[in-house]
Amino acid sequence: MQKVVLATGNPGKVRELAQLLADFGLDIVAQTELGVDSAEETGLTFIENAILKARHAAQVTGLPAIADDSGLSVDILGGAPGIYSARYAGENATDQQNLEKLLDTMKDIPDDQRQAQFNCVLVYIRHAEDPTPLVFHGRWPGFIAHKSAGNGGFGYDPIFYIPELGCTAAELTGEQKNAVSHRGQALKMMLDTLRNA
């Protein structure tokens, strides 16, 4: 089994990606288990930040790395919270604080203007100097609900409503979510590419 470092300290992302990669023959190790500090996210896009994180983890560990940069983009807010999704309510904000700030920001926004999408950029980098990192983008459209529903997932999942499923992302099982989510889409693209490489 090939060891690959997962360049995140977010336990929700580690859990989702490890579950999705279990059958692929990759031994996924979270960077925190290897004593790797988080890279500074100085990019202006999900792609830039994912590459920064993957390159940093590969450089420190000497292992191939997978990095994820993802977030929620709300149309009426010009794409916010976007790359700042994890710290929308402040630098050390909890998921609940971020979610509550978004609900408060959108309290007067009518239903027909609550479109949003989760975006996930996954980067696979073979080594720290890799000049051609593999980049995959998944997008999951939905709407921002008026209140939380469900106990699954993490982050904004309890207020991310998927009309065709009639529920929020937090009301899906992990398996259901992985089949349709932005992260599941990006990972499927990555695995298809690695399989055929």
UniProtKB/Swiss-Prot annotation:
EC number: 3.6.1.66
Reactions the enzyme catalyzes: XTP + H2O = XMP + diphosphate + H(+); dITP + H2O = dIMP + diphosphate + H(+); ITP + H2O = IMP + diphosphate + H(+)
Cofactor(s) recorded in Swiss-Prot or TrEMBL: Mg(2+)
Cofactor: how and how many bound: Binds 1 Mg(2+) ion per subunit.
Catalytic residues in the record: 69
Domain of life: Bacteria
Family: Belongs to the HAM1 NTPase family.
PANTHER family associated with the record: INOSINE TRIPHOSPHATE PYROPHOSPHATASE (PTHR11067:SF9), INOSINE TRIPHOSPHATE PYROPHOSPHATASE/HAM1 PROTEIN (PTHR11067)
Protein name per its UniProtKB record: dITP/XTP pyrophosphatase
Species whose genome carries this gene: Photorhabdus laumondii subsp. laumondii (strain DSM 15139 / CIP 105565 / TT01) (Photorhabdus luminescens subsp. laumondii)
